[in-house]
């Protein structure tokens, strides 16, 4: 390659080659990687080689790699071994090309499965198989010669298959014989490497090898298909592993799923790439530990200090920084995925002098990059874990350590591999001492697609002696895995202020009441850490008055990118605050949101944080973040305050009081029994009267929907589409369960004192029935903190262990996903005794619920109706017969004459009904109870028609399951016959026959079928309204964008995608109200 005219460019070095084959004769087919390294090492940080007619560039310095990792200039390409593996796994995550659609779909579906919470959830399965390995070595005895890579291959393959697919290879129960899948996989990887090193014409002559390759591929895919078929046949499974995500998951962006072939592609990708690299890491780690006895002893001491002799638990893993550094240093010296290949779509210059032509493969050889002496020093080839400890690792230049690849195409399973490796090495160091079977062994490398030690053997001896049976009992013991609580915890009486507690201010911005409930939970926790909440208030209450004498904690959410109603004034004030005007304010922000609203996710919390900084306020803890799509908000708040807030503002020499759960056992909320009192309510709520309550569905319907008609008091008004806030009452069944658990009668009088952060009237008597019905969320899933309190109160060690597991490893599956409440746990463990005040302190305050009003004030200005789905479904927690929605069951149980406490709230933004119905065509799209606001719109249209207004056309697209839940059918038919509206329906679970304007399918299908109607209205200037679930709204939006796109003249939009083109209409002609 000749340098271009630019005088600063130099030619990239290259070795001498032969005609036709170039440098191909230098490559050893048994060791292609290291023969390549040997060839290019003398050529410097960059070189070029030709293999036949193909030009390749290779880099070996961190300085050049740092430029290559810029994804705006260079992207991963699939060549060499990966290209050959496409015959086996096609466009799986590892081998897909950047532009392939299946990669995008699979990546978005699988990212949540490999999140931190999900990986922690897999810990029990990982530990199960690690124990099988340990038992094998214990049973074979200290003279048994261990084939290290073979046993680690068994372990990592079994672990990956069990954790991600619920399939057991049972590799430790088949003697020395590996599962046939392993033989097929090893041959396939080797064949892919050989094919990549040979020209295509030579590969075409290797008929026997090709037939073996085809046979192995067919066997592995058949095994995966069998696993899929078995899972599909298990209709009662509630698994949430990788296979479940592949089978049931839908792309959150497009709504698409994956075919069986694509699922098999990704199953094989994870089984092949995932277990091979991790088994290599474990093998190399054991080699380096044995070759460096002092390092092994230091790692073992760390494991012993953290575990304190108890079995390794998931919470131990984050407390092993030195062992983590051992694994990082192992991957630096021996990256088991030894490189990746990039290219650029256009000519690029790197290092200021090397021209990289467009579309030329650039190989990154990590075994050379990771030994760059300019970064790692003259001892770069030595094994020194200290250089990988956090304080040193964080000082490395960017992109100095890349064993998991780069950027968007980096390894999705990094967290899985890290947890697995940490667990296994920690258990091995805790259980055994080791020695090399051959003391003179020198490291040799075996290459396939990955690298592993070749012929590495060792011996293992139980550290504490005894028999394998003794060791098995030890492994399976139920020793405590958490911090040990004192049997006589110190108890402090609650204080609302003064004394030795310091004040803080808690402010919240929330429309739905979630951040408000979080604020009161935070206030309750504050008393455990030396603080009391002097003020708990909406953000608007702090406009112009942020205190400078105490910490301020702000909890906020975004609503279509805007602040909540009770934060608007504060937000506007903050936007105009002058520089340094808030100097002296000490604050931190916790943001709530949902990732499906990508464009505005966490926007308001981030802006509040930035604006406070700009005005001179000082952040005492980094902003907390909770994503309700994948997180429990109460759990994330608990984590954030425990890890960041309380340590930052603690009053005692910067040390956090960690005995909060112990204190809660004795209860900070003191309860006395006295006389009843009159109900006190939220000041902004008014008393309304139920006029009618009726079912909208037949007894044959799946799920129940209700219509509730409410008489509003004088002076309360609303507009079509506005919301009604409702103060609910807990279902009597749940209240009775609490009374039974604490042996109380419904009319027992209670009086609470001592903790004003718990949102109930203090020093006021009321019946316990009233207290439980009106003030607390009884069905809220328990948080890990709640469960730890129960564990601290438990006297039985086995019960403590079970609860500690529920608070950690199995929390997501057994608590959050099953909606297991604190009450459920107290019923499950009746032997646990906690004070009634403790129970109340742990519960969140009862929240207001928000409903769309389903009527127009033109129909009756003093009446408002609600249309709602009643949540009453089988409980997933054993012992709890039903899971009941709090507000929906309360409303469904009301009868004419019942009183209810409500408040109207204006709808914000562009969801307001058009002001002039004679000029603005309207398109309404709804599913189920999402019809509510549009019934109000239609009533308003009918009223105006009756008063002589010539209505612009309007259409309603409505989806439901069947004719049994076709809401307001006769009413809508009457409106349609009078020309108020055109209605197009979709039944998802009933054949429609010849019914007019009705389709089998979902509301999206009806919209697609009637696209001409939509386009005609759109071209006439229609505004589109959508109301329903997140999934429905997302799919409808994509469809609407495509319909609008195709309706526009091609020369106007040809440079844009449908979604890009549609953005120009989102703030003026498209409005969505989404219920989660």
UniProtKB/Swiss-Prot annotation:
Catalytic reactions of this protein: 2 oxidized [cytochrome P450] + NADPH = 2 reduced [cytochrome P450] + NADP(+) + H(+); an organic molecule + reduced [NADPH--hemoprotein reductase] + O2 = an alcohol + oxidized [NADPH--hemoprotein reductase] + H2O + H(+); dodecanoate + reduced [NADPH--hemoprotein reductase] + O2 = 9-hydroxydodecanoate + oxidized [NADPH--hemoprotein reductase] + H2O + H(+); tetradecanoate + reduced [NADPH--hemoprotein reductase] + O2 = 11-hydroxytetradecanoate + oxidized [NADPH--hemoprotein reductase] + H2O + H(+)
Residues holding heme: 411
A Pfam family that the UniProt record links to this protein: Flavodoxin_1
Function of the protein: Self-sufficient cytochrome P450 monooxygenase that catalyzes the regioselective in-chain hydroxylation of alkanes, fatty alcohols, and fatty acids, giving sub-terminal hydroxylation by acting preferentially on the omega-3 position. Produced 9-hydroxydodecanoic acid as a major product when dodecanoic acid is the substrate. Produces the omega-3 hydroxylated product, 11-hydroxytetradecanoic acid, as major product when tetradecanoic acid is the substrate.
SUPFAM superfamilies the record matches: Cytochrome P450, Ferredoxin reductase-like, C-terminal NADP-linked domain, Flavoproteins, Riboflavin synthase domain-like
The FAD-binding FR-type domain, residue ranges: 683-914
Species annotation: Hypocrea virens (strain Gv29-8 / FGSC 10586)
Residue stretches making up the Flavodoxin-like domain: 504-645
PROSITE patterns, A to Z: CYTOCHROME_P450, FAD_FR, FLAVODOXIN_LIKE
One Gene Ontology MF term: FMN binding
Enzyme Commission code(s) on record: 1.14.14.1, 1.6.2.4
Entry's family note: In the N-terminal section; belongs to the cytochrome P450 family.
This protein's UniProt keywords: Electron transport, FAD, Flavoprotein, FMN, Heme, Iron, Metal-binding, Monooxygenase, NADP, Oxidoreductase, Transport
Binding site for FMN: 510-514, 589-621
Cofactor(s) named in the record: FAD; FMN; heme
Protein name: Self-sufficient cytochrome P450 monooxygenase CYP505P1
An example Gene Ontology CC term for this record: cytosol
Superkingdom classification of source: Eukaryota
Co-factor binding details: Binds 1 FAD.
């Amino acid at each position: 390659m000749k340098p271009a005219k630019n005088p600063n460019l130099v030619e990239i070095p290259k070795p001498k080659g032969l005609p036709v084959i170039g440098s191909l004769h230098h490559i050893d087919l048994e060791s292609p990687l290291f023969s390549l390294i040997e060839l290019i090492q003398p050529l410097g940080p960059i070189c070029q080689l030709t293999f036949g007619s193909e030009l390749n560039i290779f880099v070996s310095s961190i300085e050049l790699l740092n430029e290559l990792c810029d994804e705006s200039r260079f992207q991963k390409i699939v060549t060499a071994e990966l290209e050959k593996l496409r015959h086996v796994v096609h466009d799986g995550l590892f081998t897909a090309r950047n532009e392939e659609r299946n990669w995008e779909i699979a990546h978005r579906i699988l990212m949540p499965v490999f999140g931190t919470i999900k990986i922690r959830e897999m810990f029990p399965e990982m530990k199960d198989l690690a124990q099988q390995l340990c038992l094998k070595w214990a049973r074979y005895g200290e003279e048994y010669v261990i084939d290290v890579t073979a046993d680690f291959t068994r372990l990592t393959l079994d672990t990956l298959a069990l954790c991600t697919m619920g399939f057991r290879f049972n590799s430790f129960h088949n003697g020395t014989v590996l599962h046939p899948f392993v033989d097929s996989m090893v041959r396939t990887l080797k064949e892919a490497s050989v094919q990549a090193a040979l020209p295509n014409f030579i590969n075409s002559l290797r008929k026997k090898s090709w037939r073996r390759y085809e046979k192995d591929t067919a066997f592995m895919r058949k095994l995966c298909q069998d696993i899929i078929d078995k899972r599909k046949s298990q209709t009662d499974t509630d698994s949430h592993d990788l296979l479940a995500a592949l089978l049931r998951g839908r792309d959150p962006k497009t709504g698409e799923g994956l075919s069986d072939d694509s699922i098999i592609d990704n199953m094989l990708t994870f089984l092949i790439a995932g277990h091979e690299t991790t088994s290599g890491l474990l093998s190399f780690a054991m080699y380096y530990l044995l070759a460096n006895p002092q390092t092994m002893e230091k790692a073992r001491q760390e494991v012993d200090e953290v575990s304190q002799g108890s079995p390794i638990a998931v919470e131990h893993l984050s407390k092993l920084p030195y062992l983590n550094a051992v694994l990082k240093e192992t991957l630096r010296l021996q990256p088991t995925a030894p490189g990746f290949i990039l290219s650029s779509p256009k000519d690029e210059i790197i290092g200021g002098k090397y021209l990289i032509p467009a579309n030329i493969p650039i190989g990154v050889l990590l075994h050379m990059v990771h030994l760059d002496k300019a970064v790692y020093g003259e001892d770069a080839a030595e094994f020194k874990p200290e250089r990988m400890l956090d304080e040193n690792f964080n000082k490395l230049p960017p992109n100095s350590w890349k064993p998991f690849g780069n950027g968007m195409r980096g390894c999705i399973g990094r967290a899985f591999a890290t947890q697995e490796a940490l667990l296994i090495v920690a258990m091995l160091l805790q259980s055994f001492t080791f020695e090399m079977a051959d003391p003179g062994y020198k490291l040799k490398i075996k290459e396939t697609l990955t690298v592993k030690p070749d012929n590495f053997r060792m011996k293992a001896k139980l550290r504490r002696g005894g028999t394998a049976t003794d060791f098995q009992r030890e492994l399976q013991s139920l020793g405590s895995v958490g911090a040990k609580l004192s049997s006589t915890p110190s108890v402090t009486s609650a204080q609302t202020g003064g004394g030795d507690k310091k004040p803080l201010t808690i402010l919240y911005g929330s429309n739905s009441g979630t951040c408000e409930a979080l604020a009161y939970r935070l206030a309750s926790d504050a008393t455990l850490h030396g603080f009391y909440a002097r003020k708990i208030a909406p953000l608007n209450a702090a406009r112009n008055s942020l205190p400078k004498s105490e910490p301020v904690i702000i909890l906020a959410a975004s609503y279509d990118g805007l602040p909540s109603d009770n934060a608007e004034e504060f937000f506007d004030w903050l936007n105009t605050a002058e520089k340094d005007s808030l100097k002296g304010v000490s604050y931190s922000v916790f943001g709530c949101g949902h990732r499906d609203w990508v464009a505005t996710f966490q926007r308001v919390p981030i802006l509040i944080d930035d604006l406070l900084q700009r005005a001179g306020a000082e952040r005492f803890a980094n902003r907390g973040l909770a994503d309700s799509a994948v997180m429990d908000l109460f759990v994330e708040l608990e984590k954030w305050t425990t890890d960041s807030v309380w340590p930052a503002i603690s009053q005692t020499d910067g040390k956090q009081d960690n005995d909060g759960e112990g204190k809660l056992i004795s209860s900070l909320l003191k309860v006395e029994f006295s006389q009843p009192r009159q109900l006190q309510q939220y000041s902004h709520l008014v008393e309304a009267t139920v006029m009618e309550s009726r079912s909208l569905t037949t007894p044959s319907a799946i799920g129940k929907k209700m219509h509730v008609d409410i008489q509003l008091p004088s002076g309360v008004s609303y507009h079509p589409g506005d919301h009604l806030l409702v103060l609910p009452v807990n279902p009597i069944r749940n209240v009775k369960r609490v009374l039974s658990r604490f042996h109380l009668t419904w009319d027992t009088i209670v009086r609470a004192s001592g903790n004003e952060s718990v949102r109930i009237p203090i020093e006021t008597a009321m019946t316990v029935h009233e207290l439980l019905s009106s003030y607390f969320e009884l069905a809220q899933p328990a948080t890990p903190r709640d469960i730890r309190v129960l564990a601290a109160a438990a006297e039985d060690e086995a019960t403590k262990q079970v609860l500690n597991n529920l608070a950690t490893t199995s929390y997501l599956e057994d608590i959050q996903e099953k909606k297991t409440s604190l009450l459920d746990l107290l019923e499950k463990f009746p032997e646990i005794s906690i004070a009634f005040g403790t129970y109340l302190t742990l519960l969140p305050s009862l929240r207001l619920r928000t409903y769309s009003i389903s009527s127009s004030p033109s129909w009756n200005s003093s009446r408002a109706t609600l249309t709602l789905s009643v949540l009453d479904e089988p409980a997933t927690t054993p012992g709890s017969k039903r899971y009941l929605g709090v507000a929906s069951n309360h409303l469904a149980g009301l009868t004419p004459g019942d009183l209810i406490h409500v408040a109207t709230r204006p709808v914000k933004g562009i969801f307001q009904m058009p002001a002039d119905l004679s000029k603005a065509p309207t398109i309404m799209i709804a599913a189920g109870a999402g019809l509510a606001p549009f019934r109000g719109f239609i009533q308003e249209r009918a009223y105006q028609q009756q008063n002589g207004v010539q209505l612009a056309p309007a259409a309603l697209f409505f989806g439901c399951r069947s004719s049994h839940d076709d809401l307001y059918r006769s009413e809508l038919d009457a409106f349609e016959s009078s020309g108020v509206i055109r209605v197009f329906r979709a039944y998802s679970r009933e054949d429609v026959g010849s019914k007019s304007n009705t389709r089998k399918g979902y509301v999206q299908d009806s919209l697609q079928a009637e696209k001409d109607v939509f386009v005609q209205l759109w071209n006439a200037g229609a505004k589109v309204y959508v109301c329903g679930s997140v999934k429905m709204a997302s799919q409808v939006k994509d469809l609407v964008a495509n319909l609008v796109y195709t309706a526009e003249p091609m020369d106007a939009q040809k440079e844009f995608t449908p979604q890009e083109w549609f953005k120009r209409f989102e703030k003026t002609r498209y409005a969505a109200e989404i219920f989660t």
